[in-house]
C-alpha cells in the first residue's frame, strides 16, 4: 500500500540525507569572489552546521586579502596563481568552484592534484569535451566531485521526488518547467559579461537557467533524457553571439515522460515546475530562485492541498549535504557522471534549435565551444574568474 501524501510531507524540511553520527567541520576554499560568492555562498556556509570558509581565492592579492574580513573563519586570501602553486593547501579540505563556466576546468584540475574534494558549480563547463576532462581529472586523483545542483537538496523538490516515487500522482506523463529573469535589466546590467560570451558560457539561457527545469525534472522523475527538440530566439543584439535569449525545448525521458521547458534571460522573473501524472499533479512555484517563499501544491484523486512549510536557504542545505557526505566518508551526489548527462542534453538542445529537428541525446555533434577556444578564453586576462555565476 502506498503511503498517504500526509505521511510523505510530514516534517517537510527534514534532512533525510543527514545521519545522526555526523560530526566535524569541512574547511572550504572559495574559488572566485564575485557577487554570488560574497552575497550567497559565504553567508550560507557561515550559517551551516558542518563547514566553514577558511580560504578565498581571487584575481588580486588586495581583493583576496580584503575578502578575509567577510567572516572570522577566513584565514587566507590567495591569488589564482598562488592557488595553482598550492599555497596554504593545508588550510582547506575542499573547494567550491564558482567561476564562469569555461574556467571551471583548470581550478578543478588543480584541486584534484592537491587531493581536495570538489564542489563545482553547474553546468560543469562550457563544452562537453571540457566537462569530460574535468570529471576525468577527479577520477584520476580519486577525489570526490559534487556538482552544485542546489535544487536536489531543496526540501520541496525532495518531497516531490518521494511523492512521484510512491505513485501518489500515478504514472508521470508530463513535466512543465519554466525559469526566466531580466538579466541585463535586473541581474547584471552590463552587456560585456561572460554569460554573453559563448566561449566562457557555452550559451546564455539553456546553460544558465534552462538547466534548472531540465535537471530538476530528471531528479524528480529519476529518469534521463533521450531525445530533445528546441526553438531559440534572440531579440536583443547583446545575445547575438550566444544565440539563445529565449528558448523552448521538449524532452523525451527514458521512462516515457514528456517535458516542455521554457527559459528566458529577458522576461519577467518567474519559475515553476509542474509534474502531471495519471492520478494527480504536483506543482512547485516559485521553484528555482533562492530566498523566495516556495509554494507546494498537490492534487490527487478528488483532493488537493497546499503545503505551508518552513523555508530553508538552498545554499546552506547544499553545503551541509556536501560536508556531511565527506565527514561520513560517503560519495556525494550529484556527481560528475550525472552532470555529464545534462551537458550532452544541452548540447543536443542547441543542435536541435539550430537544425530545426529532433536530436538524440549523445548524438548532437554540435558546433559548441570546443576545448581549444575555451582554453584561449581562459588565457584571456579579460575573462575574470571572479565574475561568478550559479
Swiss-Prot record:
Compositional bias segments (type: Acidic residues): 364-373
Residue segments, region Disordered: 361-390
Molecular-function annotations in GO: nucleotide binding; oxidoreductase activity
4Fe-4S in keyword set: no
Subcellular location: Secreted
EC number(s) given by UniProt: 1.1.1.424
Function: NADP-dependent D-xylose dehydrogenase involved in the degradation of D-xylose, a major component of hemicelluloses such as xylan. Catalyzes the initial reaction in the xylose utilization pathway by oxydizing D-xylose into D-xylonolactone.
Name of protein: D-xylose 1-dehydrogenase [NADP(+)] 1
Species: Haloferax volcanii (strain ATCC 29605 / DSM 3757 / JCM 8879 / NBRC 14742 / NCIMB 2012 / VKM B-1768 / DS2)
Amino acid at each position: 500500500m502506498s503511503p498517504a501524501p500526509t505521511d510523505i510531507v510530514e516534517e517537510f524540511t527534514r534532512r533525510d540525507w543527514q545521519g545522526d553520527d555526523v560530526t566535524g567541520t569541512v574547511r572550504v576554499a572559495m574559488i572566485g569572489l564575485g557577487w554570488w560568492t560574497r552575497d550567497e555562498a559565504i553567508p550560507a556556509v557561515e550559517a551551516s552546521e558542518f563547514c566553514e570558509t577558511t580560504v578565498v581565492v581571487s584575481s588580486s592579492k588586495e581583493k583576496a586579502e580584503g575578502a578575509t574580513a567577510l567572516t572570522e573563519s577566513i584565514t587566507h586570501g590567495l591569488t589564482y596563481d598562488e592557488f595553482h602553486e598550492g599555497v596554504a593547501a593545508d588550510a582547506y579540505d575542499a573547494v567550491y568552484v564558482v567561476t564562469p563556466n569555461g574556467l571551471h576546468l583548470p581550478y578543478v584540475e588543480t584541486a584534484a592534484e592537491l587531493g581536495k574534494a570538489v564542489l563545482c558549480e553547474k553546468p560543469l563547463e562550457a563544452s562537453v569535451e571540457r566537462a569530460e576532462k574535468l570529471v576525468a581529472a577527479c577520477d584520476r586523483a580519486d577525489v570526490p566531485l559534487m556538482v552544485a545542483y542546489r535544487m536536489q537538496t531543496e526540501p520541496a523538490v525532495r518531497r516531490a521526488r518521494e511523492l512521484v516515487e510512491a505513485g501518489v500522482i500515478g504514472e508521470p506523463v508530463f513535466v512543465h518547467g519554466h525559469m526566466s529573469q531580466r538579466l541585463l535589466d535586473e541581474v547584471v546590467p552590463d552587456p560585456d559579461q561572460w554569460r554573453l560570451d559563448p566561449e566562457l558560457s557555452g550559451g546564455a539561457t539553456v546553460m544558465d537557467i534552462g538547466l534548472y527545469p531540465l535537471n530538476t525534472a530528471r531528479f524528480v522523475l529519476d529518469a534521463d533524457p533521450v531525445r530533445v527538440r528546441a526553438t531559440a530566439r534572440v531579440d536583443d543584439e547583446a545575445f547575438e553571439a550566444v544565440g539563445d535569449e529565449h528558448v523552448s525545448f521538449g524532452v523525451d525521458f527514458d521512462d516515457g515522460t514528456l517535458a516542455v521547458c521554457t527559459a528566458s534571460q529577458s522576461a519577467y522573473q518567474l519559475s515553476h515546475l509542474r509534474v502531471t501524472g495519471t492520478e494527480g499533479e504536483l506543482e512547485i512555484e516559485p521553484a528555482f530562485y533562492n530566498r523566495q517563499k516556495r509554494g507546494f501544491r498537490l492534487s490527487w484523486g478528488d483532493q488537493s492541498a497546499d503545503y505551508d512549510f518552513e523555508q530553508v536557504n538552498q545554499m546552506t542545505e547544499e553545503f551541509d549535504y556536501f560536508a556531511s557526505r565527506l565527514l561520513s566518508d560517503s560519495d556525494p551526489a550529484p556527481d560528475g557522471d550525472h552532470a555529464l548527462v545534462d551537458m550532452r542534453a544541452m548540447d543536443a538542445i542547441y543542435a536541435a534549435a539550430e537544425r530545426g529537428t529532433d536530436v538524440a541525446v549523445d548524438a548532437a555533434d554540435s558546433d559548441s565551444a570546443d576545448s581549444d577556444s575555451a582554453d584561449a578564453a581562459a588565457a584571456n586576462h579579460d575573462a575574470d574568474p571572479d565574475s561568478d555565476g550559479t
